[in-house]
């Protein structure tokens, strides 16, 4: 690994950690959920107020609402130059909105994955990549 790659990895890891710390607490106050589509019985939304951008990195919160009323919320970090993403955190809610489980991830845990065609991540990526951010990281 070159020095440049090591520095980039450290910067991306720091950005992912900053995303986790700043958006995990904010998402419970989100009021701008926009419908993205269906995944089986789940309805997918993203929070327009959570979109933040720093250079080629875009942070966003997505939520999957299940038919039984439970929900899962994901905090993503997208690298728009490489068309890749990593997951910073996942929060599971019961049908009453109570938190069941919180997971946070480091880049080394989840890694950077390519945005695949026809995936939830691609749907989200297409929505945020060309839209102005409401905040910066």
Regions from the language model: what does each represent?
Residues 2-3, 29:
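Intrinsically disordered, low-complexity and often Lys/Arg-enriched segments
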Residues 3-15:
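Bacterial N-terminal signal peptides that target proteins for export
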Residues 13-21, 25:
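Hydrophobic helical h-region of N-terminal Sec-dependent signal peptides
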Residues 26-137:
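N-terminal secretory-pathway/extracellular module detecting exported/lumenal segments
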């Amino acid at each position: 690994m070159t020095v440049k790659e090591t520095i980039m990895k450290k910067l991306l890891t720091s950005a992912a950690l900053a995303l986790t710390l700043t958006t995990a607490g904010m998402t419970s106050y989100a009021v701008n959920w926009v419908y993205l589509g269906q995944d089986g019985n789940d309805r997918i939304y993203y929070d327009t107020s959570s979109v933040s951008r720093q250079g080629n990195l875009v942070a966003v919160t997505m939520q999957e609402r299940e038919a039984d009323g439970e929900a899962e919320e994901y905090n993503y970090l997208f690298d728009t130059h490489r068309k890749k993403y990593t997951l910073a955190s996942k929060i599971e809610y019961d049908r009453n909105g109570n938190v069941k489980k919180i997971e946070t991830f480091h880049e080394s845990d989840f890694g950077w994955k390519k945005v695949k065609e026809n995936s939830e991540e691609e749907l989200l990526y297409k929505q945020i990549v060309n839209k102005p951010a409401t905040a910066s990281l």
